[in-house]
């Protein structure tokens, strides 16, 4: 896809009508994807969570989520459909989460990312996330380590 696709990009709060498209993105993006049922529960019933989706021509082509835990946020997932990667959608989703975290007065954001996922790690670093630790054998599909990344926010 070309970067001209971003002209039609909208980042909105995820709603029930986006779940089917998001489930497709989830299944194409993760080795152990969340089920449609888990996605529905998160989007509709988790009062401590906020989810955004990236829409192009009304179709959800990416999504991102964050849980609020006290005064911190934990980024749960960021995923973009393979046909729409590398054109800035992931960055737009990170920006939406950062803006939301700041509007809630959160002091920090954290996330886990596969040690091998250099593309995602470089996006997070671009936005000021730093390596803060490691979870050994965190991912059950291949026992890969997770890098814990943190970003302190201005309050």
Please describe what each predicted stretch is.
Residues 4-5, 13-83, 87, 94-96, ...:
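Acetyl-CoA-dependent GNAT
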């Amino acid at each position: 896809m070309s970067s001209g696709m971003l002209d039609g990009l909208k980042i909105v709060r995820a709603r029930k009508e986006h779940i089917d498209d998001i489930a497709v993105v989830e299944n194409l993006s993760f080795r152990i994807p969340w089920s449609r049922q888990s996605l529905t529960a998160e989007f509709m019933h988790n009062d401590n969570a906020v989810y955004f989706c990236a829409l192009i021509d009304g179709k959800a082509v990416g999504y991102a989520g964050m849980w609020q835990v006290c005064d911190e946020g934990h980024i749960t997932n960021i995923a973009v459909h393979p046909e729409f990667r590398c054109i800035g959608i992931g960055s737009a989703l990170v920006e939406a989460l950062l803006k939301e975290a700041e509007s809630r007065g959160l002091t920090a954001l954290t996330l886990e990312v596969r040690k091998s996922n250099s593309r995602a790690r470089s996006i997070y670093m671009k936005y000021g996330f730093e390596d803060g630790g490691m979870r050994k054998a965190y991912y059950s599909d291949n026992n890969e380590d997770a890098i814990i990344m943190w970003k302190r926010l201005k309050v």
